[in-house]
Amino acid sequence: MDTVIELSKLLHDEEFKDNASCTSTPTLKTARIIESAVTGITLTASVPMIIIVITTMILYHRVAKHNATSFYVITLFASDFVLMWCVFFMTVNREQLFSFNRFFCQLVYFIYHAVCSYSISMLAIIATIRYKTLHRRKQTESKTYSTGRNIGILLLASSMCAIPTALFVQINGAKKTTGKCVVYLSSPKAYELFLAVKIVFSFIW
């Protein structure tokens, strides 16, 4: 119960102190500008390419419906596409080009961490399928009945892993309603959070 009360205090900004007046060194500012520029160039080049790849994979999946891997690849590139938009929103917010409210910040961070977990897990699944196919050439990929179930389970697990980050998103700015999105996690809360994750993984294992 004490943990729930402390968590509710944190979620209502009772422990978070605004740090909008904190100054940055010239080196740090330069590094952030370079990072934002590289991110912008990467997004500009990657988004059209991913759209082309997704369109091509959808057309291929319509022709080769027996191939379950193609549907996994489509969802993988779709998650990467969503991830890039999350990176775009996080970058423009960090550079203070746009100010977001707390709900939008939580939504962006939740989707960002969820699709990151999903992409990494989906890569592992695709690699496993390709490995099994190469070593069992007589086995076909016609069993697509479990594809939707596997994707649904993976999305649910990724969303559950992204919930803690979204809960600790705060607003850092002169205004209390909008500003820069930050993830504030005090040391005691971090210890309790990772302890809970450790217990959950121990039960699962």
UniProtKB/Swiss-Prot annotation:
- Topology term for the membrane: Multi-pass membrane protein
Keyword Transmembrane helix set for record = yes
GO cellular component terms given for this protein: host cell membrane; membrane
Q: What is its main location?
A: host cell
- Which cysteines are cross-linked by disulfides? C105-C181
Where does it localize? Host membrane
Q: Mind listing the UniProt keywords for this protein, alphabetically?
A: Disulfide bond, G-protein coupled receptor, Host membrane, Membrane, Receptor, Transducer, Transmembrane, Transmembrane helix
Q: Which Pfam family is one of this chain's hits?
A: 7tm_1
Transmembrane intervals? 40-60, 71-91, 107-127, 151-171, 185-205
Matching InterPro entries, A to Z?
GPCR_Rhodpsn, GPCR_Rhodpsn_7TM
Q: Name one GO molecular function term.
A: G protein-coupled receptor activity
In the record, the note on similarity to other proteins reads: Belongs to the G-protein coupled receptor 1 family.
State the name under which the record lists this protein.
G-protein coupled receptor
